[in-house]
Design a protein with these regions (language model features):
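Conserved nucleotide-binding/hydrolysis micro-motifs of P-loop NTPases
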Residues: 41-44, 69, 88-89, 119-123, ...
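Short amphipathic alpha-helical segments and helix-helix/interface helices
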Residues: 22-26, 99-107, 135
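Structural alpha-beta junctions
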Residues: 30-34, 55-59, 105-114, 139-142
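Conserved P-loop
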Residues: 2-72
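Phosphate-binding/switch loop-helix module in NTP-utilizing enzymes
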Residues: 62-115
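Phosphate-binding/switch region of NTP-binding enzymes
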Residues: 108-181
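Short, well-ordered secondary-structure micro-motifs
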Residues: 47-49, 74, 93-94, 124-128
């Protein structure tokens, strides 16, 4: 996930997608750029991830509930970031209304956008890879798809796309990438 791509971050349960989005947001806030967070935000997680920022940096963070009116006033400029945490329901398929709402948001945004959703898992307990809700449609809207999951047998997270894979470990200052042995 480089610093300019707009991304659909598909995550498994307990994979810390919100923490990773906060870490990305922190980089923007530290640089004096605006971050708009659309959706739920855990106060305790936000405190631990960005609570050390000064008031001026935190003043560039806007948090709105998904579906709120007047969202156009929230949009960051081109050097900012829009995070839409949980763009669709975590159960079943994304509804037509959810896809249309996301499409409207993406059409308004002139900045980098990161949207998250819980990945679909094999209900039968099979070992198939998780799948992304409305993947083709979202990629058609300009979002690259990344998958975030917990590694088997360890505390690491694995971030993968169609052509990349990265292992992450969480430390006191957030996530860092680790090299394969």
């Amino acid at each position: 996930m480089n610093n300019t791509d707009s991304v659909h971050l598909v995550h498994g349960p307990g994979s810390d997608a919100e923490a990773i989005c906060l870490q990305v947001s922190k980089g923007y806030l530290e640089s004096g750029q605006m971050v708009a967070w659309l959706g739920s935000l855990s106060p305790s997680l936000a405190r631990s991830a960005i609570g050390d920022l000064d008031g001026a940096a935190l003043g560039n963070l806007r948090v709105w509930e998904k579906g709120a009116l007047g969202i156009h006033r929230l949009m960051p400029p081109s050097n900012g970031l829009l995070v839409m945490h949980g763009w669709c329901s975590p159960i079943g398929r994304a509804t037509k209304a959810e896809v249309q709402y996301l499409e409207e948001i993406l059409q308004m945004a002139v900045c980098r956008v990161v949207v998250t959703s819980l990945g679909n898992q094999d209900a039968g307990g099979g070992r198939t890879q998780m799948t992304a809700r409305s993947r083709e449609r979202l990629e058609g809207m300009g979002l690259s798809t990344w998958f975030l999951s917990r590694s088997e047998g360890g505390p690491e997270r694995v971030l993968t796309s169609s052509d990349s894979s990265l292992r992450l470990v969480r430390g006191q200052d957030g996530f860092t990438s680790i090299r394969e042995p």
